[in-house]
Amino acid sequence: MKDPNTIPPWRCTDFNAWCIAVDKSTNVKNKEELLSTLTYFINYEIEMGQTYPIDIKMTRNEAEDFFFKFCTVICVPVESETSPAPDLATASIDWKTSLLGAFYIKPNYPGRCSHICNGGFLVSPSHRSKGIGRNLANAYLYFAPRIGFKSSVFNLVFATNIKSIRLWERLNFTRAGIIKDAGRLKGHEGYVDAYIYQYHFPSLEDALK
């Protein structure tokens, strides 16, 4: 697998922002605040109880391992459509107010199947309904194959998560299976089904055509 830090940032298509890959080795100015913001994002989603199977909020150390052990891509706004991607080592970014969203990329299986990745997506609670999730999804299709993954599997897309289902199917993800009674979600009686989605990344040569 390729070092995520060597992959060029991806410019968002719908607003002025860049998606940048980071991991535990990335030099980020005020990285602790970035981690704190990511921790807030995931714990907010856990508390909502609608999209992640996790039901216990993460500590700072758990979140650090969750986000930085392999790779997380962060979405950072810039002033204009001609602004370059910020240098994370030197840029003074107020992560609490500026971080638009993020997603992790990691192997979905060990060993002989580690070329198949999984991703989890988070949009800032204060920046929702602005198309950020759609841009994160497209950034995922950019970064994952460049890291070296051949395909992606999402293990649990709950049947109640209509926006997510529409997004992945619009991007030609294949519904590979259904898990009956997969989750106990807040606001729903009984159990909710979940879908498994898979996507085969085109070769980088084909993607650049």
From Swiss-Prot:
Keywords carried by this UniProt record: Acyltransferase, Cytoplasm, Mitochondrion, Transferase
Catalytic reaction list: L-glutamate 5-semialdehyde + acetyl-CoA = N-acetyl-L-glutamate 5-semialdehyde + CoA + H(+)
PROSITE patterns membership: GNAT
Binding-site list for CoA: 128-133
Annotated Gene Ontology cellular component terms: cytosol; mitochondrion; nucleus
GO molecular function: azetidine-2-carboxylic acid acetyltransferase activity
pH-dependence of activity, as noted: Optimum pH is 8.5-9 for azetidine-2-carboxylate.
Signal peptide: none
Pfam families for this protein: Acetyltransf_1 (PF00583)
Domain of life where this protein originates: Eukaryota
Record: residues binding substrate: 118, 155-156
Subcellular locations according to the entry: Cytoplasm; Mitochondrion
Keyword Hydrolase carried by entry: no
Family per record: Belongs to the acetyltransferase family.
Record's function text: N-acetyltransferase involved in oxidative stress resistance. Acetylates the toxic proline metabolism intermediate (S)-1-pyrroline-5-carboxylate (P5C), or more likely its spontaneously forming tautomer glutamate-5-semialdehyde (GSA) into N-acetyl-GSA for arginine synthesis in the mitochondria. P5C has been shown to increase the levels of reactive oxygen species (ROS) in the cell by inhibiting the function of the respiratory chain in the mitochondria. The enzyme is able to reduce intracellular ROS levels under P5C-induced oxidative stress and protects cells from damage by oxidative stress.
PANTHER family noted in UniProt: ACETYLTRANSFERASE, GNAT FAMILY (PTHR43138), N-ACETYLTRANSFERASE ACA1 (PTHR43138:SF1)
Protein name: N-acetyltransferase aca1
Source organism per UniProt: Schizosaccharomyces pombe (strain 972 / ATCC 24843) (Fission yeast)
